[in-house]
């Protein structure tokens, strides 16, 4: 077409760096190639210099939407690439329309979230999609509220101000380039790394996507050497140069990339005109060693873990709502196997992958709740970051799988009396922080000062004998220092004194307080809490410490902080004092998420410490680490989830049964994720002394933080209180969890939980749950300092099904309540069916912040004859540390009222301690 200007290519790039609200730096790069020289002059530059618009903007009223149209690589419906403001990452409908208008085209089409195509006519048989708008569903990169086509689909617009060409053609449009074209093969390169070679010219943008994974920024100085060097630096073994200035990296070619004729890789490199750097949708490919071309990716349907089955391509983000709630991002190794294994490990039976690198887990019921539907499979088109031959969804689309085998968990849903019941017990006189059952059958309540009621004494004793008579039920007691965030225990001395250590601030953090229980049910005592800070205190001040009775009868005090949100106290010490404190690096490293660490003596002779999301076994003499356990699992989408304060869950010991050959197990339920995220929805258990032991995960029916747990005399555990979101602290949790769960370790794993009755009272931060001597669970407290949830003085009881059944309780008498290890002791059964008798020993518990200090469940050996049962005490102090226990006799599931027995004596001679400060001493 002689005499007519033929502009091969014009590219305008805008880079704006704002220097102030009124001043900016604008860089304009204009690149042009001509078939005839000296014909075209750039009046545009003059316009730019005078502040004209950088890109001509189309009038929005002149564009008409035509619909969703078909497209295919190699036979494009629109033949020209549209160059847009901000490039593919900022693609919007308007940007594409403006780009096409600025190039003089009347048709504009957006595709695959990031592509803009222009022309004045439809080509290669392209037309309205046979499935309508279904596959034009991908959001625009620059505006997710708009649709930018899909795989092989264009959202097509026409500028009515420009008359399009009516002629259709099946031939490809002429290739327009930004550099002169030739048909020669690439110039041999020098200086490539050893083993690298030219592998040929290959097609890009085929079969629904790019054929190489990593796209580097465009370069105006690109050479083959520089492209290969950048890929080598990033760890890749394949490099591809495209369109003169683009460099791609990968370890193979994807999407069954077909080889093109060499003449199609004809654009010279922007940094070396003697080299060829691909062409439009053509790659000059270099590889280290042989080149691998992967097949077209498909959803993985074989080799799936467990009972997973492929279901199809599922919508996500319908009406801005995620289909599945838990997201895991894996930029390098997302596969169906990895994703689904994670989901089912944590008890989720629906899930899948999206956007190449994202894994989602949830339940089948989530799909309907989100309004998500299955769509044509081809719409899920992105390859997995960990498997380039498999599909992992697309934008807002999930490659969806469902667990089709036996259910991952079976939650029992009892009704009526079998679900238990909450009952109001009595109005309180304080908001308790610590509750402890005494061997006198009464329960001590202690509250913090400062934020507590101004007219209380900080401590009271509750006598259940008078639970119907408020005036007699509460006995006033007194403490001198603030027990806020202290730890508590029942000591193994012969009178079962109660101990609290640590506190809120100053001298309180060093506090050591003792109470000698006296009186009996219906008979008031006279003793009070005793402390003498000048004579007896901890070596280190501690806020949130743990106290534990060791196998030798001494008291181990571990961890804490210097005061409220203070520096860590990464030490441990022993009471009575036998030496200086010992530094523990693991306490310092995991602060502040390790407060109130979980501790227990182990039958093998050492000590288990579990804290934050870690656990280890300590030598009971040196406290050196002898074994590090696997990290404690957190949330399905967050390994940083933790179990100890402030990510507060609860640990208990699973029941021990004579002859005590089964390794001891521990159970931890609830917790949270850092920074006030979702609470954890699982329990985990482990037998720490078993070689190569792993944590077993059991999903709970609901999320729970600020968890409380109470062991019951039948060997089950009641899980209650807390919230579904947040962490421990004032005002840091929300969405109260009002339901109770019963955990029965005698049942198979993942079938142990029953959904029990609900309460109407939110039990949030600073709530407690503790087993009473009559088998009920006393539920108290809630002190979140949050206007959404009141300070809670009301005291409830949870009545397990064995209380509500109406069955008559067994009764017994006992003479000897001070047992030696391995000794045999007789009780007289005065009522009950001897053939159904079971006997349990429940450790005396002090409950605070979800902790159940002293919790232990033992089913000892026994034999019965003619109404007399002989019980064999546990064999040693590692199986059963010295201490006080509630002895229950059960007739089937129905427990007696407990008697209090001591096992193992007082080997640490705590009865003679402290010999200072005027403390009353019971002796040994």
From Swiss-Prot:
Statement: the UniProt record of this protein carries the keyword Repeat: yes
Signal peptide start and end residues: 1-24
Every WSC domain range: 62-160, 195-289, 307-404
Disulfide-bonded cysteines: none
Residue positions with a glycan: 90, 290, 333, 387, 455, 552, 758, 833
Pfam families the record matches: Glyoxal_oxid_N, GO-like_E_set, WSC
Keyword Secreted attributed: yes
Region of interest (Disordered), residue spans: 166-190
Subcellular location as annotated: Secreted
Chief localisation class: secreted
PROSITE patterns documented for this protein: WSC
Any one annotated GO CC term: extracellular region
Low complexity composition-biased segments: 169-189
Protein name: WSC domain-containing protein ARB_07867
Source organism of the structure: Arthroderma benhamiae (strain ATCC MYA-4681 / CBS 112371) (Trichophyton mentagrophytes)
Record lineage: Eukaryota, Fungi, Dikarya, Ascomycota, Pezizomycotina
